[in-house]
Amino acid sequence: KPWERL
């Protein structure tokens, strides 16, 4: 998921 790239 895009927000899991943090």
UniProtKB/Swiss-Prot annotation:
Subcellular location: Secreted
Organism of provenance: Pithecopus azureus (Orange-legged monkey tree frog)
Residue(s) carrying Leucine amide: L6
Keyword annotations of the record: Amidation, Amphibian defense peptide, Secreted
Family the UniProt entry places it in: Belongs to the frog skin active peptide (FSAP) family. Tryptophillin subfamily.
UniProt name for this protein: Tryptophyllin-T2-7
Principal subcellular localization: secreted
Tissue: Expressed by the skin glands.
Superkingdom of this protein's organism: Eukaryota
Example of a GO biological process term: defense response
GO cellular component terms attached to this protein's record: extracellular region
Claim: Secreted is one of the keywords in the record: yes
